[in-house]
Amino acid sequence: YASRGLGDVYKRQMLWMVIICLIGFAVCFMGLQNGIEKISKVMMSALLIIMVILAVHSVMMEGAGEGIRFYLIPDFQKIKEAGVGNVVFAALSQSFFTLSIGIGAMLIFGSYLDKSRSLTGEAVSITVLDTFVALTAGFIIIPACFSYGIQPDAGPSLIFITLPNIFAKMSGGALWGSLFFLFLTFAAVSTIIAVFENLIVFNMELFGWNRKKSVVVCAVLVVILSIPCVLGFNVLSGFQPFGDGSNIMDLEDFIVSNNFLPLGSLGYLLFCTRKNGWGWDNFIAEVNAGTGMKFPKCLKNYVAYGIPAIIIVIYLKGYYDKFAGLGTAALAGWMIVALVLLGFVFYCATAKKKVKQ
């Protein structure tokens, strides 16, 4: 019976993974205006409304004040213990992930913007809204944890273990729990729509496919490649790519967070600022076209040299932190891999080529 129950769990997880993927690709199949734009407007508006309602309810709970203080007042001793550099590194790494910097999502949706509005103003608006959503999510979770005397965790255990326990104890918990996970669903679907559209448009432009063919091919590949993620905590739990306690999701996170995001960002920067690529003059003319906030031209050296240097430090430190505990030989080997990938990005972004304007 136990094995049958576990088998049913795997099947349900697989089913919901396929359903969510199909929903995302169905929206993208309808196109920008009829699909992504219409559905995202409704979904994001509902997401923000639900977030505000949940946050107000959470901060008004008995004992929530302690959680608010924990959330908003920095503990400099903890920062000192963790190391200022590590804290800054973690914050910068999170910015890559939360803003989808480095995987092309911003590039794709930026190409859809009307020329009458400057890209700089839109970028600032996106950053402000993203920060607001992140802060509001904290007001939903942290005060509720302290109200019920539960120390807030991090990662999946916070969402799928700690919070359900809180909702189970809460008056009207079924309602608030349903609203919270509806909010998470909207957030997840909006994210996969952005990622899927990026994949679809990439194939349309690179191979000349129409949208229908690109959607079908990408949908099949994404579903197949997502299967190991679904099975990583159960059937394939014995696969531990980084030693005891690691799983397939850790490998996926390493590939994306430690490689794709920083290296993708670096590639974009080098391409936009180097003469062999798009070039600074073309870049600044594009981002400052239209009305709204303008990107300061005086920041050329910072964008061309300062930010790439910061990204390289983040990238190499990520490898060091990941593999430092494996011994000197293993660390040296992985750092060589990191440098080879870094060199490949520099070559691709700066090699002399004719760029279509």
Go through the PLM ranges and name each one.
Residues 37, 41-189, 193, 207, ...:
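Membrane-embedded translocation segments of transport machinery
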Residues 19-26, 89-100, 179-190, 256, ...:
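Hydrophobic alpha-helical transmembrane segments of multi-pass membrane proteins
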Residues 1-10:
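Single conserved hydrophobic/aromatic residue that forms the stacking wall/gate
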Residues 22-25, 52, 335-349:
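Hydrophobic core of alpha-helical transmembrane segments in multi-pass integral membrane proteins
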Residues 35-42, 121, 152-162, 175-186, ...:
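Transmembrane helix-loop boundary segments of multi-pass membrane transporters
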